[in-house]
Amino acid sequence: MGVLENLWDDVVAGPRPEAGGRGHLRRISTSLTSLNNTTEGMSVAGSVSLPASPATPVTPGSGRKVDVWRSVFHPASNVTTREIGANVFDKPSHPNSPTVYDWMYSNETRSKHR
């Protein structure tokens, strides 16, 4: 085994047991004292510091959040389509013209896979 394999094995799984074969699992110590002992010999060049998290950017006038689902479930609440909503979307153009539901559930467009 090469040096890297030994180093990887020692770092990840801990030192090899003195007795027992390869079939035995090694217990990994997760206590803080064992972690402190392993990092004593290590030094870091330079300091690592994270900047403070920036505040969430706010544009002027964006105090109220827009609920996108409100315009879907309550079409009259959408300011841009309030005027035309009832005339265009809710009423058919001709008295006997088919609606979306008529088209969806007609024999031509109904799913054959049942």
Swiss-Prot record:
InterPro entries: DRM/ARP (IPR008406). Pfam families: Auxin_repressed. Residues 87-114 are annotated as: Disordered. Belongs to the DRM1/ARP family. This is Dormancy-associated protein homolog 2. It comes from Arabidopsis thaliana (Mouse-ear cress). The gene is DRMH2.
